[in-house]
């Protein structure tokens, strides 16, 4: 009986793909070796312990319909589009060894005519006339009896967009999370013009089979039919939730300041698990009462643009004469925290 399992996703939904990965990892027999191949449409994927407001330009992501997905492994933030091929290798312990999966990916690249080397703990690099360039980054997760290694291969990713979404706005954001390192990267199409996702998947699959000396048929995972994976619906609901993707952020503080025609405003937030635990306001407005009331109302509020807007607009009942100021304030706060 084979110990290998090969899964290929035909979904571009990052929450779907990460939920599939999580379910397979939790439920696989300890004797199984798994290869899961997938890719995501426009998404910023952050590490388990990262702060999205620090790592990402969340406002631009929202404007461009780019999703945020928090993975279960550590490490930094990356931008995925359909120019990335994603891979996940899973195995039980003691057999799990990320050097084996790294070797398989390097063998796959070699079969395509690309000589790459492992660099540091997480990267694969190729030599170019301009120096070493990263073509793959990885992250890892281990539990008591199993582990996985997942990563991306840059085929034809839009590298300019990568810079757009991973460069946060210059805000006064003092955070305790991990800051991603911006790396020099290159697409494999520079070395192999015309290379496709399907060709790369085939090369990785063949290297996987060759290493273990076995072959299996691929299982295609599709959102058109709910995957036959125990607890998939619950896992997908969690993976796609605001509470997981944003609310798991480490504690951080945020200072917003702006000058309006009616006065200057400074708002100080302390945020834990996506909830405002403390809000302070400073202003030289001649009528500070609405702002003082807002600071009280914001404590316990989710750190989300729509929730902050609701808190501002709720004050219109008590301060109707300040409607113009409150609507200006509401629009500014919502824009500043996106």
Swiss-Prot record:
BPL/LPL catalytic domain mapped to chain residues: 29-216
Pathway as given in its UniProt record: Protein modification; protein lipoylation via exogenous pathway; protein N(6)-(lipoyl)lysine from lipoate: step 1/2; Protein modification; protein lipoylation via exogenous pathway; protein N(6)-(lipoyl)lysine from lipoate: step 2/2
GO annotation terms (biological process): protein modification process
Single annotated GO MF: lipoate-protein ligase activity
SUPFAM superfamilies the record matches: Class II aaRS and biotin synthetases, SufE/NifU
Broadest EC class assigned to this enzyme: ligase
Record's keyword terms, sorted: ATP-binding, Cytoplasm, Ligase, Nucleotide-binding
Recorded catalytic activity of this chain's protein: L-lysyl-[lipoyl-carrier protein] + (R)-lipoate + ATP = N(6)-[(R)-lipoyl]-L-lysyl-[lipoyl-carrier protein] + AMP + diphosphate + H(+)
Pfam families documented for this protein: Lip_prot_lig_C, LplA-B_cat
Coiled coil: none
GO cellular component, one term: cytosol
UniProt-listed Gene3D superfamilies: Bira Bifunctional Protein, Domain 2, CO dehydrogenase flavoprotein, C-terminal domain
Miscellaneous field: In the transfer reaction, the free carboxyl group of lipoic acid is attached via an amide linkage to the epsilon-amino group of a specific lysine residue of lipoyl domains of lipoate-dependent enzymes.
Protein role: Catalyzes both the ATP-dependent activation of exogenously supplied lipoate to lipoyl-AMP and the transfer of the activated lipoyl onto the lipoyl domains of lipoate-dependent enzymes.
Family in the record: Belongs to the LplA family.
Protein name: Lipoate-protein ligase A
The species this protein was found in: Salmonella agona (strain SL483)
Gene symbol of the encoding locus: lplA
